[in-house]
A protein has these predicted regions:
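Metal-dependent phosphoesterase core characteristic of DEDDh/y 3'-5' exonuclease domains
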Residues: 1-89, 94, 102-107, 111-116
């Protein structure tokens, strides 16, 4: 989303001398000029004072797969102390699937059946 993922990705791209894609070049743009839809913002409905975790939101919406043995604040230790990239990869993959399913639910579209999701 706009509060962590985008800034982090943009900083890493700049640090590695990579061009930032136009979709991430949001500075100076008006909200209606930005094509990104943040599922967390969609859920907030303008309410900035409350936070709902992805796991809780998925549970409320009946979406499977959000329960993980890992959370974003643990990734640093899992990488630097355990060196367990497979665990981080699995966590990220599940997050992407859950966010995509939430996006579909928020737009009143059919969810993708678990047997139709191929994890690469």
């Amino acid at each position: 989303g706009k509060e962590f993922d985008f800034p982090y990705l943009c900083r890493r791209m700049l640090a590695n001398n990579l061009e930032i894609p136009k979709a991430l070049q949001v500075q100076g743009k008006k909200p209606w000029e930005i094509i990104h839809q943040d599922t967390m913002e969609m859920w907030r409905f303008g309410d900035r004072k409350n936070y709902t975790s992805l796991e809780l939101l998925a549970e409320m919406m009946g979406i499977e797969g959000a329960k993980s043995d890992l959370s974003g604040d643990q990734v640093h230790d899992v990488y630097y102390k355990e060196g367990n990239l497979a665990r981080i990869e699995s966590y990220c993959m599940e997050d992407v699937i859950v966010v995509a399913q939430l996006y579909l639910r928020f737009h009143f579209m059919n969810l993708v059946e678990p047997h139709n999701i191929q994890k690469l």
